[in-house]
Amino acid sequence: MPLQKLLLPIIFVLFIFQTGCKKDKVQDNNIELLHAERGVRKGFFDAQGRQVILRGVNYNCLGDYWVANQDVPPVKPYDPEDFRMMAEEGFNCVRLLFHWSRLEPVRGQYNQAYITDIKRAIEDASRYGIYVLLDMHQDAWGKYIASKPEDACNYPNNGWDGAPEWATFTDGQSTCKDDASGVGGRETAPAVYHAFQHFFDNTDGIQDACINAWAALAKETAKYPNVVGYDILNEPNLGYKPLLEEVGKLGRFYGKTIAAIRNAERSVGAPQHIMFFEMSVTWQGQGIPFIAMPDFTDDKNIVFAPHTYFEAITYLLTLEQGYDLLSGLSNAYQTGMFIGEYGYFDGDINVSVAKLKRFAVKEDGNFGSSTYWQWCQTPGDPHGISWDGQSYGERSMALIETDWKGNYTGNKNEALLRILSRSYPRAIQGKPKKFSTDPENGALYLEAATNQEGHTLLWLNQRFGEPKFRCSNGEVKALQQVYGGYLADISVRDTYSIEVYYE
């Protein structure tokens, strides 16, 4: 069936007076718990009711991936210095990948050393004013589904990441891929979608165990205000049973997990954190994305968190059309939208830069939040190494570069970071109306309306020098130097506008 037809169900559910600004004494920038709202006023908000924008990156250094070659590690060693470098790019959010396979390697026994590592990363990020989104990550179910030499595959499948071995039931199905399409073909292996079928059927209680593992981690992390929330499951696959049946199971899994995490938060006297939920990416091993029906929960503190790889992996829609489609789906849920993953990986960096600039325009115009894929990717990552472990690059560039030993080389992807590190409002008083920015000259324009006086916060890149301001109904109360730039605290009232420029 053409993919266009398969997307149809998704689509269906679908004057300014210029004044000079004065500068006063700087203020502290304390990180605080955020919440989400649904309905007419949807998105991320702080305790003062200001709309918050999150910009950041995915980070996999605590990941538990399949190893193709023992001499070529699949992840870079964890280093808190990464968070400092992220902060210098203006990032205020990191999507921190973790894996169930390391959290619960033995059934019913949670890896306290791993939980400590996760908590340390949360604390390290907090020192740089970075929010952490905890993401239970998986790709193609887990690292225990990998083709063996005796499988005699025409197209052998790398192992990936996700579930522990004890929760991997494949019915003896083939691990071989349908074709040589690389990453995009990993889910075509019958062993992968049989494993997901067992998960959604709760065979041997493995889905319950996964939910319990989430609750256990939430008890340990709910005390941190910089934990922005929990991403329930990365890119879930559906099984092989009838589509609507499987979609219903996805929704029930989300609902049960949200309830369990809420109980865990209450049990330790912690406030609620935002729940992030995604759309499925396959059914019967084929690229048939679908969404859970909107009635899976009445929880208000949730956000739709899809991934978009239009003009990167799929070309069915333009990246702008894809963004609009996903925004329409978030409207169906009456939630805010957070793009958990997106990226451009063309052989010509100039092509990727052009696409990223277009995405930036679309995102800014929608006051969007996102995390780019990804901070670092070693040559030994399953995305880059061959199945037999013999073919891999000497170096690998994501946003930073690593060598084949997994070490940071000191090189950065300056072309992409120049766009990703563009200035943006971190907290907006009142109702946002218009926002644009130019990563080439640092110019920023923001317009909003408020029925009470308040403060809007802007992060401004230092690349262009000290910023200048033209405001209507606004006054700069503080301009604080922070990592990578400036934090501008602007007192605003009524319908206001802020223009940032450089001389």
Predicted features and spans:
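Bacterial N-terminal signal peptides that target proteins for export
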Residues: 1-8
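Active-site mouth of glycoside hydrolases
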Residues: 36-54, 58-274, 279-290
